[in-house]
Amino acid sequence: MKMTKSDRIDRIVERLAEMPAVEKVEPLAEGICDRISVIQRRLMLRHKRSLGRHGISWRDWQVLTNLLLGGDTPRSPSDLASTLMVTTGAMTNVLDRLEEAGLTRRVRNPADRRSVIVEATDDGVALWYAAVNELGSQEAGVVSVLTAAEQRQLNSLLRKVLAGFGDGDNWDEETA
């Protein structure tokens, strides 16, 4: 692998290490975590711009993704709100917007006619596929600086770091 020259994070970590009152910062860990954070922010900005070109927000995308990747379990508005950690009022606004755009619909729950479930429409599914392919291309471009073997190694190492939080697949909770 071709080594890159030092970057801004290296310089920040070096200055941090020189500060006498900073005792608990491990420079290597700081560099790793800072880089993960910067990569996440940059990728999120690219994704949000792409989703905007498709006429949806990040939150809209999360709802469609949960509907399409959530398996066969019907999803209620309150279930979606809980999964995405937003209020039911905020979820109502998102669902109203998606329904107005023709991307989702609320239908009576056949198991309990007092409640509704949310479904993606054919247009919602088509938009999701177009967007997921665009986002996937962006992600592939980001890691294309690595060989396939390096990508597998990085993926394995990041999985190990993520497992180190010790909370299983509960990775999207803000209680960490």
Where are these regions (language model features)?
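N-terminal leader segment of winged-helix/HTH proteins
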Residues: 1-54
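N-terminal helix-turn-helix DNA-binding core of bacterial DNA-binding proteins
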Residues: 27, 37, 41-87, 169-176
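Alpha-helical linker/hinge and terminal dimerization helices associated
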Residues: 43, 84, 127-146, 161-172
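Alpha-helix C-capping/helix-to-loop hinge sites
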Residues: 19, 50, 70, 138-145
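Amphipathic alpha-helical interaction segments
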Residues: 31-38, 62, 153-156, 160
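Charged, amphipathic alpha-helical coiled-coil/dimerization segments
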Residues: 96-156
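C-terminal regulatory/oligomerization modules of transcriptional regulators
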Residues: 1-24, 149-152, 156-176
